[in-house]
Design a protein with these regions (language model features):
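Active-site- or binding-pocket-proximal scaffold segments within functional domains
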Residues: 1-246
């Protein structure tokens, strides 16, 4: 326990010199990791409630979210529909790991991607999509899985989402659409509708998958057309009643 505490303090305080001086007998040699798979990493540690998160976040800022040089493959599933500002995603920069990082965007919010459904089983088929994708990637990289394992995880891209407004989610008033496509390692999953209607903003290589008119999803809030005046209605009536070619 003492060694674990010492290692934790060195990691937390960023004491590189202290790490170098640790007894080699207490440390493992360089161990390569085939794959790290994460679900919508948001760096949202501590109490993620309005205002209270500001009190706890400084305690966790020391965490290093970058992939280590001993990681061969980094795979991340990301939520397109999450809008809570406190849940901004930590998207990896693939420049330091060219060709080794894959980040896939899926329909759904943070709890959908992570499988935190709170008993809402109707959302399970949507949450299973990133799960099956992640397990498939792990299997391709050598993780042995039972035969026909996919049959245990039915998927449906049209299934309802848990959403981000349920329960305490209503208290998160600070909202902003996510930005997808800034890194070359980002892609849209095949289950996402094309053109993608939002709310996330697509940029980079994903920009071409956005609708030509990105605000068209708001058309149901458009103002109604002006009601014609009596004179306009009287003028239109004879034209409407006239026979074709008359």
């Amino acid at each position: 326990p003492q060694n674990v505490h010492q290692a934790w303090q060195l990691y937390r305080n960023g004491a590189d010199l202290g790490v170098e001086q640790m007894d080699p007998a207490l440390c493992h040699p360089f161990v390569p990791i085939r794959m790290i798979g994460v679900f919508d990493t948001v760096m949202a540690l501590g109490i993620r409630l309005p205002l209270l998160w500001m009190l706890t976040e400084p305690r966790f800022r020391f965490h290093d979210e970058h992939l280590g040089r001993h990681v061969e493959h980094g795979v991340q599933a990301l939520a397109l529909d999450e809008t809570r500002a406190a849940f901004q995603p930590l998207v990896w920069d693939s420049e330091s790991h060219p060709g080794q990082i894959e980040q896939m965007w899926f329909r759904g919010c943070h709890p959908d991607i992570g499988g935190q459904l709170s008993g809402l089983e109707y959302a399970r088929p949507l949450a299973n999509i990133p799960l099956v994708w992640m397990m498939t990637r792990a299997e391709e990289l050598g993780l042995p899985l039972p035969a026909h394992w996919q049959s245990h995880f039915p998927c449906d891209p049209t299934a309802p989402s848990v959403g981000s407004w349920r329960s305490w989610g209503k208290a998160f008033l600070a909202r902003a659409p996510r930005l997808a496509g800034a890194d070359p390692s980002e892609s849209l999953h095949t289950s996402v509708a094309r053109p993608y209607p939002g709310p996330a903003l697509l940029t980079g290589a994903l920009a071409e998958k956005a609708p030509e008119h990105p605000h068209r999803r708001r058309k149901r809030f458009a103002r109604p057309k002006a009601v014609p005046t009596v004179e306009q209605a009287d003028m239109a009536a004879p034209a409407a009643s006239a026979p074709p070619g008359g």
